[in-house]
Design a protein with these regions (language model features):
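Class I S-adenosyl-L-methionine
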Residues: 17-28, 32-55, 74-245
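Short beta->alpha connector loops
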Residues: 10-13, 63, 85-87
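Short, well-ordered alpha-helical scaffold segments within catalytic/effector domains
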Residues: 8, 12, 66-70, 165-169
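Conserved SAM-binding strand-loop segment of SAM-dependent methyltransferases
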Residues: 3-13, 229-231
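Generic secondary-structure boundary/loop-capping signal
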Residues: 9-12, 57, 116
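Sequence-level motif detector for i,i+2 pairs with an aromatic at +2
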Residues: 1-4, 114
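A short glycine-rich, Lys/Arg-flanked "PGG" loop and its adjoining helix->strand segment in the class I
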Residues: 63-79
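A short acidic, glycine-rich active-site loop
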Residues: 52-64
Length: 245
């Protein structure tokens, strides 16, 4: 049975205690840094800058992730996928043949970024994932280029840097194999954790802000309870999914 666990702690403290190559793949979304006074980068949700959500009491941290973080990340993981890698060219200081492009399928006239980039350590071709993600306009299961008609099925936003579960599911299907151990150092909304749980992958995540940790715990509990209700059927689907990789 797979292990899926999250910790409310600073990932730097945790990584310093880890052995080399503790994880097969780290899929991370470190803090890009403040780009405007009084705002934050919303790279995961809108691709632009906006005010802090009113229902969140904790202040969003603005400090850009430093080189020490990447040094530890490369030490504790065999491969890496780093969202916002274009912001960290100097800190990463490594070439990449395989970038991931997330096309958000924005309609014309939207002022936010059309896509987000992820640096990867893989020696393969650049890959594109297309999935609509603009406010209430979210992609449909099975065809992310088309808008979900029933808004009640949309993912609820609980973090300013949230990415869709579908994106992490696609990443895991294309860049992992059964038995891999996954790391997320900036857990945020927990989308990465949910995708790993559904696919039966070992996962460890860290989130130091308690308000976001608690929100993702609640979200994960709701999702995992639904999955567990249909465990036998899901097990068959998981096996078929990985057999097709």
């Amino acid at each position: 049975m797979s292990v899926n666990i999250a910790y409310n702690m600073d990932c730097m403290i945790a990584m310093r205690e880890m052995p080399d190559n503790a994880f097969d793949l780290a899929v991370v979304d470190p803090i890009y840094g403040d780009v405007t006074a009084g705002g934050y980068i919303t790279g995961k949700s809108q691709g632009g800058v906006g005010p802090h959500p009113k229902h969140h009491d904790a202040a969003w941290k603005q400090e850009k992730t430093g080189a020490d973080y990447f040094k530890e990340l490369f030490r504790v993981s065999k491969n890496q996928i780093i969202w916002g890698g274009n912001y960290f060219v100097k800190e990463i200081a490594r070439d990449s043949q395989c970038w991931i492009v997330w096309d958000k399928c924005h309609p014309e006239g939207i002022k936010f970024a059309d896509a987000e980039l992820a640096w990867t350590s893989f020696n393969s071709k650049t890959r594109i994932f297309r999935y609509m993600w603009n406010g209430m306009c979210q992609g449909m299961p099975g065809d992310g280029t088309k808008m979900q008609g029933d808004k009640s099925l949309n993912e609820k936003r609980i973090h300013p840097m949230q990415k869709p579960v579908a994106l992490y599911t696609w990443i895991y299907k294309n860049f992992t194999k059964r038995g891999d151990r996954l790391l997320d150092t900036h857990l945020g909304s927990g989308s990465s954790r949910i995708a790993a749980y559904t696919l039966g992958l070992d996962f460890t995540g860290y989130e130091k802000e308690k308000i976001y940790f608690d929100l993702q715990e609640k979200r994960f509990a709701a999702h995992s309870s639904q999955v567990d209700m249909f465990l036998d059927g899901w097990a068959v689907e998981k096996q078929l999914t990985f057999d097709g990789l």
